[in-house]
């Protein structure tokens, strides 16, 4: 959520930033109009309350002097009714303002390129060279079925489209990837490992920006009023919701693996085969809490943490900065890492790393103190995929496939695969 003072002090800046995202800047005028009404109501209510205090003193004085106080008692009742009415109007305006403010996205950083879609994202780095095959490479969905690593048909029978059973060495590879990623982030990148709740309440989803605007993208357990998480970013960021982080704690760096659940509303017809776009998938997440002056350097560091995984696995990738028309709701700036997939003859997103500045912290009331005597300030929150496990799985299977149908295990994963160096079709 944005600071109301930005609307008051820099309305034109806010309008231009909102317009860059393709949203209607008139919302700024709506907020300012409601804010003016609110301030007038507060002023009028305070005057009434001051008068009520004065009248209360007059009533007490008249009673002490055994004088008739009917007139001031009547005024007191009228003031009480009027104050109650003003408070009701104020609550209504507050509700309207919050309803509008919570749907306004974060302000985009000045160095984010302008554009309308992912076609306008700007490449800033490329690593590795896509492999030239001496044979016709197969898509990962064909490879995993031939090697008995996955079963899409039975998953469709059990759960519907966009689900998968990982079987045999497919399940082992998925587990190995998660263990490898978590181990690297905790032992080399300084993150604290967390196991997170995968069902969360509405306040938690509100804190990170999924609610109320993106409810159609979520799965909800109606009976309990809980939501399945779309990413571990949600419970990890909300760890400090409604808390003041004590001096000396920041920077705080969390990493955690979880299943992620997404309805994929609006993605009909896109990536319908394989592991790229599922309703349920595994992901290792990185979340950071930073002092405001440190968050931009933290974004660069976190992105290189994700890149280190891809480089150690030997997977060609590129880094792009998302344009104004493609960046997420809560982010001020986002880097996407895209891995090379031979079946697409293109790069596909495998990680998204964002600085959300104080946007989520304001929604979730996450503050910190620089020292014991200092006034609490809003922290900056960052999040990044480190990495999407299913897409990493797909990238390994495609990039490390062999002409005889086997798949070579990247050297970095061999210890996590029990020493296994190759995946072959099971004997039975």
From Swiss-Prot:
It is found in: Cytoplasm. This is Serine--tRNA ligase. One of its GO terms (biological process) is selenocysteine biosynthetic process. It comes from Staphylococcus aureus (strain MRSA252). Its EC number is 6.1.1.11. L-serine binds at residues 231-233, 285, 385. Catalyzes the attachment of serine to tRNA(Ser). Is also able to aminoacylate tRNA(Sec) with serine, to form the misacylated tRNA L-seryl-tRNA(Sec), which will be further converted into selenocysteinyl-tRNA(Sec). Belongs to the class-II aminoacyl-tRNA synthetase family. Type-1 seryl-tRNA synthetase subfamily. ATP binds at residues 262-264, 349-352. The keyword Oxidoreductase does not apply. It catalyses: tRNA(Ser) + L-serine + ATP = L-seryl-tRNA(Ser) + AMP + diphosphate + H(+); tRNA(Sec) + L-serine + ATP = L-seryl-tRNA(Sec) + AMP + diphosphate + H(+). GO terms for molecular function: ATP binding; catalytic activity, acting on a protein; serine-tRNA ligase activity; transferase activity. Keywords: Aminoacyl-tRNA synthetase, ATP-binding, Cytoplasm, Ligase, Nucleotide-binding, Protein biosynthesis. Consists of two distinct domains, a catalytic core and a N-terminal extension that is involved in tRNA binding. PANTHER family: SERINE--TRNA LIGASE (PTHR43697:SF1), SERYL-TRNA SYNTHETASE (PTHR43697). The keyword Cytoplasm applies. Pfam families: Seryl_tRNA_N, tRNA-synt_2b.
